[in-house]
């Protein structure tokens, strides 16, 4: 395993937190919090621009995506009064997939050493990368020594065989390369890739919730992130390529109107609330493709029907991901809903009924001293990136090397959870 170290805290490094989403591109420039300050970071500057060139988190127009990143970074640099070189990048593309598996090493009755732990991790990396997918994240769930289970740290203990249950998050290689390339064209060095669902979950949950078991749903414009923690361990981090924009597309198609009008209608009366009293209220809108200003109207009940159909389909896909990850209904105690799309009226109630769990809205945790203007579910992922980068409680290390392009992706397996 390559040499690793925790981020240095005595001389705070300057780092960018970059979230290139379907609807918006956000860049925070941060430094490790000074001694005596609450929270993991001091925010030096913030930049945000509408995204272009992405679809469901995937880069489809390189030049357009690059210009958005450049604009967001420049805005953050002006606010911070410094030039940004290194970024931590959130990833929602590449068909993120969670895998849980076991690795073991024979040690013939002696005490477990660091070298044995490294062998286990190396075996885990080889296993998940065998089909050419890139490893983004890997965390240990628990260790076993022979027949003894539930061991948090086996080092120094004797056994014939040491084994570990691992959870890994992988992604298709090409979409990751394209995302990294966008940042590199903006003269940024990508020092780490973090699964976006994992980051947003860290940003809106407490350690106590993650210990008790929690599911986090991050409803974005083009994707919906799913993360599950059980007993404090990440057990699922996946992305469904469906988000708020798909509701707008459905409204535009179903009502035969423009996408702009569909967005207006969604904001005005989009809901999944059942039993509303005004489902027959007419909603006027402009027809698409007509010569002259022709209008039509639809009942709010029709709007709700279109919205609800898409929301039901999305949650069916989320349920399939949970089943594929072997996460049963009793694994989590509650659901946390976050992301800009999570503010759709009635969505939290629908989620609670669908999963049979209590639900709360997830906002960036105030305890971390986040700027008041950024205390919105839309910035949950960025706050999670801050914890990954600087908070020792997040337990993440990064390689001493800075990787670029394919070199980063070939070596990303070295940047792993410190809980090993």
Identify what each model region corresponds to.
Residues 42, 219-223, 227, 351-366:
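Acidic-glycine-rich active-site phosphate/pyrophosphate-binding loop
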Residues 212-254:
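Glycine-rich phosphate-binding loop of actin/hexokinase-like ATP-binding domains
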Residues 1-24, 28-215, 233-235, 244, ...:
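Nucleotide/phosphate-binding catalytic cleft detector across ATP-hydrolyzing
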Residues 206-208, 340-354, 375:
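Short glycine/threonine-rich loop-to-helix capping motif typified by GTGT followed
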Residues 310-319:
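A general structural motif
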Residues 89-94, 333-343:
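Glycine-rich beta-strand-to-loop/alpha-helix junction loops that act as flexible
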Residues 318, 337, 385:
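Hydrophobic, well-ordered secondary-structure elements that form the walls
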Residues 25, 201-202, 212, 221-227, ...:
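Short glycine/serine/threonine-rich phosphate/pyrophosphate-binding segments
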